[in-house]
């Protein structure tokens, strides 16, 4: 354990979209001599990733309320009070100089407990539309960090920081000019794979003239990779289909164009890598936050926003033909994406935490 006054508590859980930016900040705190502890819940991905990172993980019992039955709703106040008390006990034991929350069910009770203990609370919102817990915690927070501008209402607390992403994803601007080789298309469906994209891309690419057709690397998810490869084979399109991508920096460095969903971290990584994209937001995401994320790049001309409901194979093929016939357009989009990146996001978030911790 670090010396007195050198503990920091990070709260993040549930999905990688919350946990990965938090891990980036955890490493930055450690570089500056702080001991990082983590507050999570028993069911989230943090139970795998946080111990792998060598960080102590403290658990509280809390879950979401959306879509739950009447009995769960009746129990909710008691469950939340219990979670707050559990978090307060952990905070009193650790005596952190600040508490930094990234979202997930753990953040609500943990944020309330931080306020009860008199520990400065900083929250970070990864999406362009703030989650419920973060919205409710704004009045209790010393600072509120947002990845995208104007996610929160204007106030003295608000800071636009960007999303912390791994430094290796910030790419050198130099790529082999497209005129000297075939274009390279990277398709990302997330760790589980996005089946609508898995069905859409083979059909769309079959409608792109063979002379114009790009090299294709398609990450389809473990369940869907075999059938996706078969779909490409059936329409006569060459593609490398994989369940996962272990080295995202290498994949981004290879690509000229990306087709993917619009999760907050993905959007930030595309900017970091300086990659143009065609974004198909998950249509049923909470508060439609993926559409708002995609608009950040699309408004500036770094991406095309393609709603799933109105994007079929013909529409996607038309858009692909448009940019593949105009490689200079892809170059302009890439430069715009790179200008929207926030390479200092991780250090900025940590600076803000230490500013409120130590005045």
Swiss-Prot record:
What does the entry list as the binding residues for UDP-N-acetyl-alpha-D-glucosamine? 15-17, 127, 166, 191, 245, 264-269, 290
GO BP, sorted A to Z: carbohydrate metabolic process; cell division; cell wall organization; lipid glycosylation; peptidoglycan biosynthetic process; regulation of cell shape
Per the record, what are the reactions this protein catalyses?
Answer: di-trans,octa-cis-undecaprenyl diphospho-N-acetyl-alpha-D-muramoyl-L-alanyl-D-glutamyl-meso-2,6-diaminopimeloyl-D-alanyl-D-alanine + UDP-N-acetyl-alpha-D-glucosamine = di-trans,octa-cis-undecaprenyl diphospho-[N-acetyl-alpha-D-glucosaminyl-(1->4)]-N-acetyl-alpha-D-muramoyl-L-alanyl-D-glutamyl-meso-2,6-diaminopimeloyl-D-alanyl-D-alanine + UDP + H(+)
Q: Record's superkingdom? A: Bacteria
| Swiss-Prot/TrEMBL keywords | Cell cycle, Cell division, Cell inner membrane, Cell membrane, Cell shape, Cell wall biogenesis/degradation, Glycosyltransferase, Membrane, Peptidoglycan synthesis, Transferase
Compartments where located? Cell inner membrane
Major subcellular site:
membrane
Q: Which CDD domains match?
A: GT28_MurG
Pfam families assigned to the protein according to its UniProt record, in alphabetical order = Glyco_tran_28_C, Glyco_transf_28
Topology with regard to the membrane? Peripheral membrane protein
The answer, when asked if Nucleotide-binding is one of the entry's keywords, is no
Q: Which InterPro entries match?
A: GlcNAc_MurG (IPR006009), Glyco_trans_28_C (IPR007235), GlycoTrans_28_N (IPR004276)
Please report which protein family the annotation says this sequence is part of.
Belongs to the glycosyltransferase 28 family. MurG subfamily.
Tell me, what does this protein do in biology?
Answer: Cell wall formation. Catalyzes the transfer of a GlcNAc subunit on undecaprenyl-pyrophosphoryl-MurNAc-pentapeptide (lipid intermediate I) to form undecaprenyl-pyrophosphoryl-MurNAc-(pentapeptide)GlcNAc (lipid intermediate II).
Write the protein's name: UDP-N-acetylglucosamine--N-acetylmuramyl-(pentapeptide) pyrophosphoryl-undecaprenol N-acetylglucosamine transferase
Organism per entry = Pseudomonas putida (strain ATCC 700007 / DSM 6899 / JCM 31910 / BCRC 17059 / LMG 24140 / F1)
């Amino acid at each position: 354990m670090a010396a007195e006054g050198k503990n920091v508590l990070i709260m993040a859980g549930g999905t990688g979209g919350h946990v990965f930016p938090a891990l980036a900040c955890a490493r930055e705190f450690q570089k500056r001599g702080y001991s990082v502890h983590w507050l999570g819940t028993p069911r989230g991905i943090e139970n795998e990733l946080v111990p792998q990172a060598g960080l102590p993980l403290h658990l509280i019992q809390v879950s979401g309320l959306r879509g739950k039955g009447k009995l769960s709703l009746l129990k909710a106040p008691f469950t939340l009070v219990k979670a707050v008390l559990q978090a307060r006990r952990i905070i009193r034991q650790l005596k952190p100089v600040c508490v930094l929350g990234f979202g997930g069910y753990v953040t609500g009770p943990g944020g309330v407990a931080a306020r009860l203990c008199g520990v400065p609370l900083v929250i970070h919102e990864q999406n362009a539309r703030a989650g419920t817990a973060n919205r409710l915690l704004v009045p209790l927070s010393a600072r509120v960090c947002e990845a995208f501008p104007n996610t929160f209402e204007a106030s003295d607390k608000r800071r636009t920081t960007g999303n912390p992403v791994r430094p290796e994803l910030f790419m050198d601007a130099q790529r082999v000019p497209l005129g000297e080789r075939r274009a390279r298309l990277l398709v990302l469906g997330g760790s589980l794979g996005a089946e609508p994209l898995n069905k859409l891309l083979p059909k769309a690419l079959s409608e792109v003239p063979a002379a114009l057709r790009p090299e294709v690397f398609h990450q389809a998810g473990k369940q869907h990779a075999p059938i996706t490869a078969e779909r490409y084979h059936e329409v006569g399109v060459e593609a490398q289909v994989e369940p996962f991508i272990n080295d995202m920096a290498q994949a981004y460095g290879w690509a000229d164009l990306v087709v993917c969903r619009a999760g907050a971290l993905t959007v930030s990584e595309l900017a970091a890598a300086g990659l143009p994209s065609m974004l198909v937001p998950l249509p049923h995401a909470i508060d439609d936050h993926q559409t708002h994320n995609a608009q950040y790049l699309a408004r500036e001309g770094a991406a095309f926003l393609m709603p799933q409901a109105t994007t079929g194979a013909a529409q996607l093929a038309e858009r692909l033909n448009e940019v593949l016939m105009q490689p200079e357009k892809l170059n302009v989009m890439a430069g715009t994406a790179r200008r929207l990146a926030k390479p200092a996001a991780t250090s900025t978030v940590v600076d803000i935490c230490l500013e409120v911790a130590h005045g």
